[in-house]
Structures are given as C-alpha cells and as structure tokens.
C-alpha cells in the first residue's frame, strides 16, 4: 500500500510540474528580482569599497584580489583554477591565463589576471546577485555594477532556472573552448567523480586520477583525443594568491552548489505558488513542494552522493583549517562542517 501511495504522490508531482506556472520569472511581482531591496553580504559592503572606507591593496592584481577576499572573509585557499572558456570573459581565459575562483558559504569571487572581477553574492530570498567590475588602477576606487548578463548562464536548466550557481565540466580544445561536455544540466554531489573537473586544474596528491581535470583535447577522426595539462606548466603561479587548485574545494563547491540551487528552487516555487494562490497553495503545487522537500532531505543526508575511492581522498591541510575555522559546534561538540 505504501508503495502505491508513494507512486501516486510522485505521479502527482510530475503531473503538477508538467502543468506548472513560470515560477522562476525574475520580473514576476512575486519575486521582483531587479527591484527588491537586497540583503546579501557583498551588496552591504559596496559603499565601503566605492568610498575607500574599506581599503583595498592596488599594488598588483594578486594583492588586490587577496585584499578583496580578506574583506569578504573568503579563504585564499579555496582557490580553483579553470582554463576552459566557459564563462563571461572568454577572451581572457586560457591555459596561459586561467580564471581563479574563490568562495565561502555566501560569496563567490571570479578573478582573471587582466580581466574584470566577478561576484556572486547570495541573497536568502532572491539567490545569486551578480556584480562585475574592473580591477582599479592605483589611486582609483572601484566602480561596482550589478550585471544582468550573468543570468544567461546562471538562471538556466542546470541551475533549476533560478539565479543560482553554475558549474560545468568540459574538455577544452586547442582554442580553450569546449569540444566535449560532461554531466549536462546536472549540478551536485551525486555526479560521479569521473565526470567532474573538466576544464579545471586539480592539484595535490588526491589519491585518484579518474576525473576530467588537467586535460586538454583535440578532435581526430571524429574522436576526442586528450592529453595531460599539468598545473603551472603554461602560467606563473606567482600571479595568483595561492599555488593550489585542490580537490577539497572542488568537492565542496560541487556539494554546496547543488544544495544552494535546490533550496532556491523551493524558495522561488513556494513564493510564486503563494502569489498566484493569493496566500494559499493548491494541492497540485503542494505536491510539487512536497517532492522537492523529499529531494532536499535526501541531499542533506548525502543519500545519493557519488562513490569515493576506497582509500579516501588526500586534501590540502590549509583549506581544511580555513574551512573549519568558523565551524559551529552542537552541544555534543560535533559540527556539520566536520570533514
């Protein structure tokens, strides 16, 4: 009987989704994405950056990004390097000039030597708030603008159509654009490790090599032939604040992105459903939210997490220390951040 009830509930959820409203429309009065007062960490700091109250180091690109990260409480050790041209500033990115990414629980920073700085700052109601600005020259103050172009990649199917977090895994070709794509329209810790990290550098002795990182490719006779691109062989580590692109921040970013996008979809759906129902949620929409709730619980419990190597994974101790620095302990001394 329970199996029949579960099947009926799931069928109702799928039916509801098929007949669904456009829950993700940012212009909807339910969301007011572009006009609602913002409550994300970076927005609250903008005035301080633009007036110089929050001082930044303009000595070099490396010094600038390091000082910005310090203000945002984003650890330098979270650095990930991506050499595929799979983001907004494609003309700057290559194996000779990788794009660096840094993150904590609420703010995500993109830095390309010679390019613009990109920010995703999470608003609890609206999701990702996107900013982009030039790296100021010495003596100048930053002019920070909210970006709408980022939504072209950060509010699509793989982000559950809400302003969320986007991750891709590709094989870059000779011009650093994608010639092969993996895990299409999927983000989260359920993705097999063998399908992850394409277009990124992975440093350190992680203990396994069955992933798509550190590879470039070319098409030969209709097939993609790949070869290893060792980190640091085409660029100088000294222009970045750290000399790592470690496996642990890779894994945590994947897990975190899947969680954030799932929570934001539930938030957007619930708000949209309440709006069209004038404060009420009808049974059809309730079934959708119930299905999402069950998916969220499974995600929180790591029920469908991809299998790890039997011997575990070796990680950068510096990032471990930085990640655990703000852990909040329960009464028994353990924390959800414990690794």
PLM segments and residue spans:
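Sec-dependent signal peptide recognition
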Residues: 2-9
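Generic detector of well-ordered alpha-helical segments enriched in charged/polar residues
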Residues: 43, 62-70, 249, 290-301, ...
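Acidic/aromatic/glycine-rich contiguous surface patches that form carbohydrate-binding/processing clefts
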Residues: 307-339
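N-terminal alpha-helical interaction blocks
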Residues: 20-114
